[in-house]
């Protein structure tokens, strides 16, 4: 039943009469709404941007989308199997449970509201984009909200909704309606009704702004007529009682609305009017018992998009605490998409927002959904078949937690984070355009409604946690504007127009930033642009005019703010910061008229500014970006650089300038005065088409010192190089120093230059001048480069008859100048003939050169009476021959002369032509610079195919004849050569080496692998007597390295080697060989005898003996003896061990006995005690402690009561025992902890639950719940694959293990094994057969009466997967078994036998790992098992 409003009460409401007179001058709501309500701006921004590939992130489509019922029945368990959880991901700060919905982050403890994930912050974008957003306080509305709270007890504001009207709900149940001029139009409801219904918790206005829906904190819903202010419906039974209305939303259909309550349920409200009676039907779309929805957003379309094919589905997006759903309300209820969040901070707020965007030339809705710091964009499209497809676009990862997301247009979004900071983001580039604080708004929060405090707080803890930061009803957007509801005010934010953004920067005196922003507008690269024409030419014209205005203002400000006093450097720095900006933007705008007109005149008023201006032009001129400069500016530019002594800069500028802008007379005079030859050449060539005069001037600079034989200065060398480059450019048709000569002048210039070069005499020639002065000067300056210039020129003159004549003529001149004069070096003469040889060797050669000239050159280069420049002469002749000059010589005569002159490289060149490779060996051996290269040469000839057998045999024989010479040259290289190519002649080679030292070096390189020679000893098969011969030489020349060498040598006989070492009295080496032979006792006696002799030497030393040397010798021998005993004790019985250790102990204690009986103590008494203690510690591991003590006490000396002398030894033994016992216990404890951790980790891994990757069978690709034809079991594997048992049986993926059936994953096994599964379990461990751990039966969807899924196997038997994991654990700790270690430790700890010095033990006790020499404890953290 409808309830009519109390009209009289409405008229008497003080709120209706209170109208704020003072309106914000900067805010015109109606104009702004009309400006941003059209779609054209969105389309334009979207089409201008880079297109997004909507197929790149396409979400796979399923044949049969899930029904709403199936989704509602899904559990909201967020746990995922086989994921190692990071406890820090769920770090939630303490939340103030007493916060109210009207409290603001700024006015309360904002630190309790968010757990921000602070990553690196984005850079400040103010200088790039300026101020993008403009915010204004709606003073009229704000004042009336405060007035209503004071005068009519309306309460504080709680919700806002905006359309062409603005509706504000209050905590006492009133709805205040304002028009576009901020005038109060209606006050809906009353405080009495508010006391019954509670606060307004949600508002919604329909599309045509005719109806208002109000949701209340106690669950009621009212509908109002906004035209008349009448109450049309009061709905109390749309949803379960006791829950607050969190959201209420009109759809595009005015008869259909959606509401969401604090129970997490979503209901569809259908409004009908039958026979004048208004009714409301409610239908549950989502039950809160299956997952609480806390945010809903229907898709709204603008009037121009009413016919869009997607609007007929009436899409609705819902966000629960675990997933996003997109459903269609029409024509029938259908789920189109589900998207799970993944792991999120439970206190973060889910957000949804729709907007139509243009992608790939079509306009479609895009859904933005976010929670925490991640924003996802989903594009919704309809295909030709009528189905809806959802594709995922780029996501946005932020460094702050969001509480609101709002579209301004299709390119720009506004985000609000949990500390009330606003972020303006460009969606496609993800660039942050602006940030601003809005704490002054004192934003209203909806916490009390999410906690449902008005109805007793009967909500879940998860929803209450989300409600701490919920402000859904406090922010509303309409027509490109965003309204923020504060506790006492309403603010509106909108994008600034492009002019406003520039003006905002200009007001703050940020002229440089304003120009940069304007240029981005000009180039179409700016973001969030409002107010510019879409036509490119119009846009550039409008922006350019505005930039010119700013540039004038910028120039005036630069002149006004120039420091009046101070150093000139301060003024220069000021203008260097400002003037380049003016120059840059004038040139960018292509306004040279402005730059060299008004701007130059304005800046010329200040001399410093004028100088900086002229200097700013330099980089543009050098890069050819600025060519046309007015003559006056160019004149001032040259004068300025002249005054500052920057002549090189002037020269670089002139050659890039248009010649018409130069004062030629001024420039030529300046160039001559300051020797700016590049500029001079440029002016002569471009200004007067004169190419010869510059050469004459340059020749006058370098010719006199060259003719006088003087060394050129650096400046003269530079001039000569410039002259060569200039001649080369002229002959090649290129302009100097850059550009090209006009095509019509190229032949003329070439002829003029050739005629100039071959002149017989210069213009002002003296009587003493030699002929052809120009050619002579260039040859003296740089022969090689001048000839290179000519060679390049000859390449271009092939088809020119006159040029051919020039070639012959200049060659004749070159020969005449160089051959008939003796003032040229061999290198210069060689360069000439090399040049000639190359020209003569060409197939189209037309030159003629007398052959006798080459013979003269050969005689000149090979003259034996001149030893100077030997290498230079040889190199010149070699280049001449390689260039083709060999055809000009008689080869036999050439070889004779080269041998006579010791030109071995020439000889090699000639011998190689005649295939006399054996003679080349002599060339290498006789050439001290290349003698070591002979080995590579011999190896290449003998191994590389392409040489005949006779040639190889001759080289082989030649090398054999010179073997001793090769060995003396480099023994290691010779040994490698012999091992590779002369392995069968080793004894012959050894016989040739008469020098014993040389033979020793050769054999060491051949046999000792430590020498680095790559020799395969197995293929070499050296007889033992050669190895023994090397050992004997080693004993002679390097006795201290014998043992180390014997350890790596092979193929020697022990008896003969022992005789050799005994011959040279190398006792340690003999002992090593005896031990290797197996005579450990004989080796021990030999070392013991050596030790005793050294101890005797030390005891009878005199004052002149070096004590340290004797003590070092004793210590070294003792250490070797102890090592021998330790190596052999493991293989001996107790009696044999005592036979080794006790004589050693006796030998060490004997000198101490003698010193105790002597009157004066021995000087090394303490050192001997320390060494004796070392012996005791070493033998304690093999001899029982009682046996050692008994042996000591049986000594006649200590048996008579002199135990005090050995007290230190006994106490040291006991301390060692205590230390080792502590170490043993600590090791056992560590091993126990390590094993316990590993077993616990293994148990946790194999008992973890499984999570399927998909909900369909990986073989038949059908959903496991859809198979109705048979009661299949469902088999889930640890790899995540899921199968029907019938499908898996059809693929033969079963095997029998101990009489039980085991399953194997079809995908994993087929990708790792080629054939069928092996029946051998050990083979299955080698492959990657993933066993099943969970079975579910049956596969179809269970009804409520069906029994729960049963486990397949109840017996506690390890399946192959668990066995594989256990084997992996064993491999991690491969080596000595840890269980065996613990068993041994536990057995030995029982009694006295645990002591290392206990009495005789049985064999197994002394064969344990603790007695092994290489036993090591792996004291490292245990490996982390992969989940």
From Swiss-Prot:
Zinc finger RING-type: from-to: 1257-1309
Molecular function in Gene Ontology: zinc ion binding
Database matches in SMART domains: RING
Residues annotated as transmembrane: none
GO CC list: CORVET complex; early endosome
Keyword check for Thylakoid: no
Record PTM Phosphoserine, positions in chain: 26, 32, 127
UniProt biased composition (Basic and acidic residues): 1343-1353
Keywords recorded for this protein, A-Z: Metal-binding, Phosphoprotein, WD repeat, Zinc, Zinc-finger
Spans of repeat WD: 193-234
InterPro entries: Vps41/Vps8 (IPR045111), Vps8_central_dom (IPR025941), WD40/YVTN_repeat-like_dom_sf (IPR015943), WD40_repeat_dom_sf (IPR036322), WD40_rpt (IPR001680), Znf_RING (IPR001841), Znf_RING/FYVE/PHD (IPR013083), Znf_RING_Vps8 (IPR056939)
Bias kind Polar residues: ranges: 1329-1342
Any single GO BP term: endosomal vesicle fusion
Region (Disordered): 1311-1355
Subunit structure, as described in the record: Interacts with RAB5C. Interacts with TGFBRAP1. Component of the putative class C core vacuole/endosome tethering (CORVET) complex; the core of which is composed of the class C Vps proteins VPS11, VPS16, VPS18 and VPS33A, associated with VPS8 and TGFBRAP1.
Its job: Plays a role in vesicle-mediated protein trafficking of the endocytic membrane transport pathway. Believed to act as a component of the putative CORVET endosomal tethering complexes which is proposed to be involved in the Rab5-to-Rab7 endosome conversion probably implicating MON1A/B, and via binding SNAREs and SNARE complexes to mediate tethering and docking events during SNARE-mediated membrane fusion. The CORVET complex is proposed to function as a Rab5 effector to mediate early endosome fusion probably in specific endosome subpopulations.
Similarity comment: Belongs to the VPS8 family.
Annotated protein name in UniProt: Vacuolar protein sorting-associated protein 8 homolog
Record organism: Mus musculus
Lineage: Eukaryota, Metazoa, Chordata, Craniata, Vertebrata
Gene name, Swiss-Prot/TrEMBL: Vps8
């Amino acid at each position: 039943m409808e309830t009519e409003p109390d009209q009289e009460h409405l008229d008497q409401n003080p709120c209706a009469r209170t109208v704020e007179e003072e309106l914000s001058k900067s805010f015109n709501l109606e104009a702004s709404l009309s400006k941003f309500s059209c779609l054209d701006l969105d389309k334009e921004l979207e089409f201008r941007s880079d297109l997004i590939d909507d197929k790149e992130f396409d979400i796979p489509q399923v044949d049969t989308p899930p029904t709403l019922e199936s989704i509602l029945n899904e559990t909201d368990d967020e746990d995922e199997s086989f994921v190692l959880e990071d406890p820090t991901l769920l770090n939630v700060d303490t939340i103030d449970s007493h916060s109210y919905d009207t409290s603001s982050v700024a006015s309360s403890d904002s630190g309790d509201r968010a757990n921000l994930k602070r990553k690196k912050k984005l850079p400040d974008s103010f200088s790039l984009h300026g101020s993008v957003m403009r915010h204004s306080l709606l003073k009229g509305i704000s004042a009336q909200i405060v007035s209503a709270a004071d005068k009519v007890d309306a309460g504080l504001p709680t919700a806002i909704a905006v359309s062409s009207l603005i509706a504000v709900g209050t905590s006492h149940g009133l709805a205040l309606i304002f028009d576009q001029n901020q005038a109060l139009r209606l006050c809906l409801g009353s405080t009495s009704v508010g006391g019954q219904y509670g606060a307004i918790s949600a508002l919604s206005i329909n599309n045509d702004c005719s109806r208002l829906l109000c949701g209340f904190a106690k669950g009621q819903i009212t509908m109002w007529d906004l035209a008349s202010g009448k109450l049309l419906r009061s709905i109390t039974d749309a949803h379960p009682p006791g829950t607050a209305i969190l959201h209420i939303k009109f759809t595009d259909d005015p008869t259909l609305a959606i509401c969401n309550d604090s129970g997490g349920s979503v209901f569809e409200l259908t409004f009908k009017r039958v026979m004048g009676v208004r009714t409301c039907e409610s239908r549950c779309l989502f039950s809160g018992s299956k997952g609480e929805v806390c945010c809903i957003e229907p898709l709204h379309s603008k009037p121009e998009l009413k016919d869009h094919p997607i609007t007929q589905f009436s899409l609705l997006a819902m966000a629960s605490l675990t997933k996003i759903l997109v459903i269609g309300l029409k024509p029938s209820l259908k789920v189109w998409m589900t998207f799970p969040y993944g792991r999120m901070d439970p206190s973060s707020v889910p957000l949804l927002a729709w907007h139509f965007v243009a992608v790939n030339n079509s306009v479609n809705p895009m859904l933005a959904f976010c929670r925490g710091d991640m924003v996802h964009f989903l594009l919704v499209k309809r295909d030709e078949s009528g189905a809806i497809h959802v594709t995922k676009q780029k996501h946005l990862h932020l460094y702050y937690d969001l509480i609101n997301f709002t579209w301004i247009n299709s390119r720009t979004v506004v985000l609000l984070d949990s500390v009330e900071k606003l972020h303006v983001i460009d969606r496609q580039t993800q660039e942050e355009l602006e940030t601003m604080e809005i704490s002054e708004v004192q934003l209203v929060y909806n916490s009390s409604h999410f906690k449902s405090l008005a109805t007793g707080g009967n909500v879940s803890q998860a929803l209450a946690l989300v409600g701490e930061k919920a402000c859904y009803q406090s922010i509303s957007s309409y027509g490109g504007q965003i309204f923020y509801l504060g506790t006492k005010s309403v603010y509106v934010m909108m994008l600034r127009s492009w002019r406003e953004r520039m003006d905002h920067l200009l007001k703050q005196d940020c002229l440089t930033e304003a120009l940069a922003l304007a240029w981005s507008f000009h180039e179409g690269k700016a973001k969030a642009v409002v107010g510019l024409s879409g036509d490119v030419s119009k846009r550039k014209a409008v922006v350019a005019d505005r930039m010119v205005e700013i540039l004038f203002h910028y120039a005036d400000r630069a002149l006004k703010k120039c420091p009046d006093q101070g150093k000139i450097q301060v003024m220069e720095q000021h203008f260097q910061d400002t003037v380049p900006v003016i120059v840059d933007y004038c040139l960018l705008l292509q306004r040279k008229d402005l730059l060299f007109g008004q701007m130059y005149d304005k800046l010329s008023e200040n001399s410093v500014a004028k100088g900086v201006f002229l200097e700013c032009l330099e980089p543009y001129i050098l890069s050819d970006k600025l060519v046309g400069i007015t003559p006056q500016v160019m004149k001032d530019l040259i004068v300025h650089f002249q005054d500052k002594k920057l002549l090189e800069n002037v020269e670089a500028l002139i050659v890039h300038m248009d010649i018409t802008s130069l004062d030629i007379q001024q420039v030529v005079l300046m160039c001559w005065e300051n020797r700016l030859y590049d500029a001079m050449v440029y002016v002569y060539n471009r200004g007067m088409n004169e190419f010869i005069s510059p050469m004459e001037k340059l020749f006058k600079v370098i010719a006199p010192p060259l003719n006088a034989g003087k060394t050129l200065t650096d400046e003269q060398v530079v001039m000569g190089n410039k002259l060569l480059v200039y001649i080369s450019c002229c002959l090649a048709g290129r302009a100097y120093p850059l550009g090209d000569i006009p095509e019509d002048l190229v032949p003329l210039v070439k002829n003029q230059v050739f005629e100039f070069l071959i002149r017989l005499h210069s213009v002002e020639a003296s009587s003493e001048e030699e002929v052809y002065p120009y050619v002579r000067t260039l040859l003296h300056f740089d022969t090689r480069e001048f000839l290179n210039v000519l060679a390049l020129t000859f390449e271009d003159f092939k088809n020119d008859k006159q040029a051919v004549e020039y070639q012959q003529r200049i060659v004749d001149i070159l020969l005449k100048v160089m051959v008939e004069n003796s003032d040229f070096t061999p290198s210069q003469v060689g360069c000439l003939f090399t040049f000639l040889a190359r020209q003569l060797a060409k197939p189209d050669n037309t030159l003629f050169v007398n052959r006798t000239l080459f013979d003269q050159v050969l005689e000149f280069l090979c003259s034996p009476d001149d030893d100077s420049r030997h290498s230079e002469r040889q190199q010149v002749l070699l280049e001449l021959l390689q260039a083709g000059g060999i055809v000009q010589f008689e080869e036999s005569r050439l070889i004779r002369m080269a041998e006579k002159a010791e030109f071995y490289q020439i000889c090699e060149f000639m011998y190689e032509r005649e295939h006399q490779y054996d003679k080349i060996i002599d060339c290498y051996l006789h050439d001290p610079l290349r003698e070591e290269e002979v080995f590579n040469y011999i190896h290449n000839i003998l191994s590389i195919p392409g040489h005949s057998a006779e040639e190889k045999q001759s080289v082989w024989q030649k090398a054999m004849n010179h073997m001793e010479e090769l060995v003396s040259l480099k023994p290691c290289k010779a040994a490698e050569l012999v091992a590779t190519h002369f392995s069968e002649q080793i004894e012959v080679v050894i016989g040739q080496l008469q020098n014993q030292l040389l033979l020793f070096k050769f054999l060491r390189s051949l046999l000792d692998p430590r020498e680095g020679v790559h020799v395969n000893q197995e293929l070499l098969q050296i007889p033992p007597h050669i190895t023994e011969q090397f050992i004997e030489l080693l004993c002679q020349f390097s006795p201290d390295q014998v043992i180390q060498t014997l350890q790596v040598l092979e193929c020697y006989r022990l008896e003969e080697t022992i005789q050799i070492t005994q011959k040279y009295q190398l006792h340690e080496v003999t002992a090593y060989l005896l031990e290797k032979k197996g005579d450990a006792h004989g080796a021990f006696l030999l070392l013991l005898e050596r030790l005793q002799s050294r101890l005797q030497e030390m005891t009878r030393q005199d004052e002149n003996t070096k004590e340290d040397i004797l003590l070092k010798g004793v210590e070294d021998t003792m250490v070797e003896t102890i090592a021998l005993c330790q190596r052999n004790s493991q293989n001996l019985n107790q009696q044999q061990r005592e036979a080794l250790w006790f004589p050693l102990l006796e030998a060490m204690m004997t000198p101490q006995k003698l010193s105790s009986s002597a009157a004066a103590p021995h000087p090394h008494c303490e050192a001997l005690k320390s060494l004796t203690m070392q012996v005791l510690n070493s033998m304690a591991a093999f001899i029982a402690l009682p046996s050692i003590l008994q042996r000591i006490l049986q000594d006649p000396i200590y048996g008579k009561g002199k135990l005090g002398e050995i007290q230190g030894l006994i106490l040291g033994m006991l301390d060692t025992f205590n230390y080792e016992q502590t170490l043993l216990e600590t090791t056992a404890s560590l091993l126990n902890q390590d094993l316990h951790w590993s077993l616990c980790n293994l148990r946790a891994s194999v008992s973890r639950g499984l999570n399927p990757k998909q909900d369909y069978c990986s073989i038949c690709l059908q959903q496991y719940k859809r198979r109705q034809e048979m009661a299949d079991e469902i088999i889930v594997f640890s790899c995540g694959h899921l199968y029907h048992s019938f499908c898996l049986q059809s693929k033969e993926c079963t095997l029998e293990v101990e009489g039980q059936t085991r399953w194997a994953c079809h995908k994993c096994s087929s990708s790792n094994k080629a054939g069928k599964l092996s029946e051998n379990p050990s083979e299955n461990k080698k492959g990657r057969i993933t066993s099943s751990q969970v079975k579910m039966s049956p596969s179809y969807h269970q009804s409520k009466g069906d029994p729960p899924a049963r486990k397949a196997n109840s017996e506690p038997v390890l399946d192959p997967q668990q066995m594989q994991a256990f084997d992996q654990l064993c491999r991690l700790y491969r080596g000595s078994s840890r269980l065996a270690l613990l068993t041994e430790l536990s057995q030995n700890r029982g009694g006295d036998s645990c002591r290392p010095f206990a009495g005789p033990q049985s064999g197994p006790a002394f064969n344990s790992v603790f007695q092994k020499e290489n036993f090591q404890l792996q004291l490292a953290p245990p490996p982390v098992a992969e989940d």
